């Protein structure tokens, strides 16, 4: 039986389009993503509040304190404290500082923006990154031994220090106090005198 010409043409066109679509959607590779969700739960005690927002106030410094790229100044400690952790909680609880709009992947530090942060009413995070980026300076997050915690790196390579739980007063639950540093850090360009603000989100990582 012969197939009519027009029908044969339609079949050929369909086959050609299918081949083109298949080629257009061909993959160059595959990303396999894995993870683990634990039923371990702790309560974030500090920073408190519904959004667990902590304001770390760096000291007012002279721009002359930041001369060469990588120079740090104004190191300021801050804590993230957990409570009501289960007694079975293991050692090495730490913060994972999440990548976000303020992350500079080329330096591993946080972009700083020329603005004053307000707490009442609270400045919206989107307003921070909408401000003009500060020149010549960023903000670095470090461990207490001053080793850099690399922003934009994954949890395994970020190098944030882990902390061990302690028995909570008056019970068997545990508390964890994580201690880190924030500081100014010199980057390319001349440092401009101005107020600066930046931010970074964090997640608690359990052993």
Curated annotation (Swiss-Prot):
InterPro entries the record matches: Adhesion_dom_fimbrial_sf, Adhesion_dom_sf, Bact_Fimbrial_Adh_Pro, FimA-like
Keyword Repressor carried by entry: no
Signal peptide: 1-26
SUPFAM superfamilies named among the record's database cross-references: Bacterial adhesins (SSF49401)
Principal subcellular localization: other
GO BP, sorted A to Z: cell adhesion involved in single-species biofilm formation
Subcellular location field: Fimbrium
Cystine pairings recorded for this chain: 42-85
Domain of life assignment: Bacteria
UniProt family annotation: Belongs to the fimbrial protein family.
Its biological purpose: Bordetella pertussis is the causative agent of whooping cough. An essential step in the disease process is the attachment of the bacteria to the ciliated epithelium of the respiratory tract, enabling the organism to resist normal host-clearance mechanisms. It is unclear which bacterial cell surface component are responsible for adherence but the fimbriae of B.pertussis are prime candidates for being involved in this process.
Name of protein: Serotype 2 fimbrial subunit
Organism: Bordetella pertussis (strain Tohama I / ATCC BAA-589 / NCTC 13251)
């Amino acid at each position: 039986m012969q197939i009519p010409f027009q029908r044969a043409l339609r079949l050929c066109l369909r086959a050609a389009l299918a081949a083109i679509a298949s080629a257009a959607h061909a993959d160059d590779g595959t990303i396999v993503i894995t993870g683990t969700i634990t039923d371990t739960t702790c309560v974030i005690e500090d920073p408190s509040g519904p959004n667990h927002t902590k304001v770390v106030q760096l000291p007012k410094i002279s721009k002359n304190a930041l001369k060469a790229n990588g120079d740090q100044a104004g190191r300021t400690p801050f804590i993230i404290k957990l409570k009501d952790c289960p007694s079975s909680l293991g050692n090495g609880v730490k913060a994972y500082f999440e990548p976000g709009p303020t992350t500079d992947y080329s330096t591993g530090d946080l972009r700083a923006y020329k603005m004053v942060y307000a707490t009442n009413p609270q400045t919206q995070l989107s307003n921070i990154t909408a401000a003009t980026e500060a020149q010549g300076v960023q903000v670095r997050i470090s461990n207490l031994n001053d080793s850099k915690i690399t922003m934009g790196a994954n949890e395994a390579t970020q190098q944030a220090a882990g902390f061990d739980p302690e028995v909570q007063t008056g019970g068997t639950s545990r508390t964890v106090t994580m201690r880190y540093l924030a500081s100014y850090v010199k980057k390319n360009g001349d440092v401009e005198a101005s107020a600066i603000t930046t931010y970074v989100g964090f997640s608690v990582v359990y052993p």
